[in-house]
A protein has these predicted regions:
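Short beta-strand elements in bilobed, periplasmic/extracellular small-molecule ligand-binding domains
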Residues: 114-124, 217, 233-257
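Short, solvent-exposed amphipathic alpha-helices that sit
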Residues: 11, 101-115, 199-202, 223-242, ...
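An alpha-beta-alpha
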Residues: 201-241, 350-365
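Flexible loop/turn connectors
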Residues: 266-370
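Hydrophobic alpha-helical segments within soluble ligand-binding/sensing domains
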Residues: 180-182, 187-217, 255-265, 324-343
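Alpha-helical recognition/docking segments in bacterial nutrient-uptake
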Residues: 4-7, 25, 43-48, 54, ...
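Periplasmic-binding protein-like
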Residues: 92, 144-153, 216-219, 269-280, ...
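Extreme N-terminal segment that seeds HTH/winged-HTH DNA-binding domains in transcriptional regulators
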Residues: 1-30, 64-85, 353
């Protein structure tokens, strides 16, 4: 039995010496054995100093050590640190959708991975938590080195099962554009997100600065909305403004969109509000179209700020809008992952939670109230 293992080890060394570096899954394919077996072989040979093991890949060391010798010590006598992540790195990324918002985020991540010589593998969960699980499993089976995850959490909050899945991952993971619950079990995971609380507050402060004191919020029911609402409510309270009821709206439901637009129209006509923040652009443009049909105009009758800024500039009256830094979030997630991979297996570097500030762009849809 041992002779078979030794023969396989020699074959592993022969392939890696010839190729220079390759992924564990590629090595398993050449040998005709499972990836689990190859990982075991690579770990044994790396401990002997005969190979260099990276996350999900293996390379030929500059100075391979003779059989039976352990890892080469540094000048201080301690074991040399793990090598940094390299061009062999493959990252998996799971997002709930590839609509505009997510497409830009993915593009930012893709460009950042490519700039480092790596590869990004994409999975789309279609807003289903069970599909998150399936995509993550597929990527782990494929031997990815790390995961960038934007889970389909209901209202932005993970269930116990979703938490347990993330805690059990055997590769590093970065949460993307998801807020880690305060004091929750996921606090040890790295995360990077747009600060939608600040984004919602920025919209209120802009309108209040123009003199508006009755500002409505129309928001979708998705993982981002609770944070936009939180920022809206905090800014309204800080400014001492009246707070009209928050309206939830589904832009994909024509009846719901019609009802929300009608409520906004009646609130303007009765002078209950003078301005509105609408999440997202699709909803905002749909509402504006209805208001125009019913005789209201922007910004003469009502001021409006859209939250998302993907197509807000294309409205008949270009909409002032808050833009989450989607591409920058994707780039930052990749940077965070490569830093984690470069620290080596078992490294005790503290986890990082990074939030990026959205940008408000002033266009033609806001003016002081009449």
């Amino acid at each position: 039995m041992r002779s078979h293992v030794n023969q396989r080890h020699e074959r592993v060394l022969e392939i890696v010496r010839r190729r220079g570096s390759l992924r564990v899954t590629e090595l398993a394919g050449e040998l005709g054995v499972s990836a689990v077996t190859v990982r075991r072989d690579v770990e044994a040979l790396a401990e002997q100093g005969r190979l260099t093991r990276l996350h999900g890949s293996v390379s030929w060391p500059e100075r391979p050590r003779p059989l039976g010798h352990g890892p080469e010590p540094t000048a201080s006598g301690t074991e040399a640190p793990a090598p940094p992540a390299s061009a062999a790195v493959v990252l998996g990324m799971v997002v709930p959708s590839m609509e505009h918002y997510f497409a830009e985020l993915v593009k930012g991540a893709q460009d950042a991975v490519a700039a480092r010589g790596g590869r990004l593998v994409l999975g789309i969960a279609h807003w289903r938590s069970e599909e998150d699980t399936a995509q993550i499993g597929r990527m782990l089976d494929g031997g990815v080195d790390g995961l960038l995850l934007q889970p389909s959490w209901e209202r932005g909050v993970p269930s116990t099962a979703q938490e347990e899945q993330l805690l059990a991952l055997r590769v590093p993971a970065v949460l993307v554009d998801r807020r880690v619950p305060l004091g929750g079990r996921l606090a040890g995971l790295d995360s990077v997100r747009s600060d939608h609380v600040l984004g919602g507050a920025a919209a209120v402060h802009h309108l209040a600065g123009l003199g508006h004191d009755r500002i409505a919020l129309l928001a979708q029911d998705n993982p981002t909305s609770p944070q936009v609402r939180e920022g809206y409510e905090a800014a309204v309270a800080a400014r001492g403004l009246s707070a009209p009821p928050i309206v939830s709206v589904d832009p994909e439901d024509p009846a719901a969109l019609e009802a929300a637009a009608r409520l906004l129209y009646e609130s303007v006509a009765d002078n209950r509000i003078t301005a509105a923040i609408v999440h997202n652009d699709q909803t905002a443009i749909g509402v504006v179209q209805r208001l125009r049909e019913w005789g209201l105009s922007l910004p003469a009758d009502v001021s409006l700020v859209a939250y998302e800024d993907e197509m807000a500039a294309l409205a008949d009256v270009p909409l002032t809008a808050v833009a989450p830094p989607r591409s920058a979030v994707g780039e930052a997630a990749v940077e965070m992952m490569f830093a984690r991979l470069g620290a080596g297996p078992g490294a005790s570097a503290p986890s990082r939670h990074v939030s990026l500030v959205p940008r408000l762009t002033v266009r033609a849809s806001c003016a002081p109230p009449r």
